[in-house]
């Protein structure tokens, strides 16, 4: 769906399509345990978040050089542009690369070779968000932030992702305080598999400005009331929720109920290569299955720009919003 939109919940490593994975494996002499792209695609069947993460980290082995990260980002940007994305705030997971001996500079500089020219090449403005892996230690997160300091002119904010259960936001209080002191924006995954209390903790302890996922807020009327009152955006990922069994079927997704409650919801793709759809595909899926009206779809697109970190360029944001209003379905 080419409705103009911003994508705010997108893991760049999760855009690694099987074809590119094999291309990079051949380039770097990495042997993948799959005969071909078809066999690899069949492996994209997940029972839960952890089974997805196991494959996600396994395939990262093909990402070695600046050129690899540049090619990965450009492949995403080309697909996103074709689906109406005008602005993208892109997550990356440096700890997973540092652990493999890939330096922070290789990752950031490689991504920036694509992001720095994304407006000229793809018509998309971008921001880069460094995510900490919550199943790693708080000390590792602090070390990662320290390693990122030479590149903060290219990093807009920090996030928190990976396995949620058993890793509450409180664990990362210190690194989020350090990030805030550096002037970085703050978001965090919360309330996907973890309980509603993790959402409140992310707000109260980490000071996040957006909640990534946040689906389980619906279990707490008090939390919903707070999110509505404070206009805290939620970056929902419907096809991801189905694939990871957060909801049983798309028809059962609470997005319509959340919108009716006044929550500031956005629709995003999460890890589109693994979950069977980019952001435009997610829009089409919720339109068809959840029967969202054109007004609701326009609201989702409008929310995506309003929830973005474009405060430093209000003229651009206003232009994007006018494109949403002018769009004809």
In which residue ranges do the predicted regions lie?
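Metal-cofactor-binding active-site regions of metalloenzymes
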Residues: 1-184, 193-198, 205, 209-210, ...
């Amino acid at each position: 769906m080419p409705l103009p939109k911003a994508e705010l919940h997108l893991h760049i490593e999760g855009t690694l399509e099987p074809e590119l994975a094999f291309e990079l494996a051949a380039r770097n002499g990495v042997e993948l345990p799959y005969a071909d792209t078809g066999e690899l695609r069949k492996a994209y069947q997940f029972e839960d978040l952890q089974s997805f993460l196991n494959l996600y980290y396994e395939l990262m082995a093909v990402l070695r050089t600046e050129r690899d990260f540049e090619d990965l980002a450009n492949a995403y940007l080309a697909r996103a542009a074709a689906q109406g994305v005008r602005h993208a705030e892109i997550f990356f997971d440096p700890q997973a690369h540092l652990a493999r001996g890939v330096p922070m500079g290789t990752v950031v500089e490689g991504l920036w070779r694509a992001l720095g020219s994304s407006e000229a090449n793809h018509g998309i403005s971008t921001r880069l968000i460094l995510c900490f892996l919550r199943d790693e230690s708080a000390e590792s997160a602090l070390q990662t932030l320290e390693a990122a300091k030479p590149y903060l002119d290219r990093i807009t904010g920090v996030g928190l992702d990976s396995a949620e259960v058993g890793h509450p936001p409180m664990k990362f209080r210190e690194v989020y305080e350090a990030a805030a002191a550096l002037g970085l924006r703050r978001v965090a995954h919360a309330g996907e598999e973890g309980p509603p209390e993790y959402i409140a903790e992310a707000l109260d302890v980490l000071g996040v400005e957006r909640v990534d996922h946040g689906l389980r807020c619906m279990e707490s009327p008090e939390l919903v009331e707070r999110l509505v009152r404070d206009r805290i955006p939620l970056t929902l990922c419907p096809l991801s929720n189905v694939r990871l069994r957060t909801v049983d079927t798309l028809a059962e997704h609470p997005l319509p109920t959340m919108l009716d409650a006044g929550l500031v919801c956005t629709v995003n793709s999460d890890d589109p290569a693994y979950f069977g759809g980019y952001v435009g595909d997610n829009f089409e899926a919720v339109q068809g299955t959840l029967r969202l009206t054109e007004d609701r779809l326009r609201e989702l697109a409008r929310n995506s720009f309003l929830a973005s970190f474009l405060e430093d360029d209000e003229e651009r944001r206003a232009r994007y919003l006018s494109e949403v209003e002018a769009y004809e379905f």
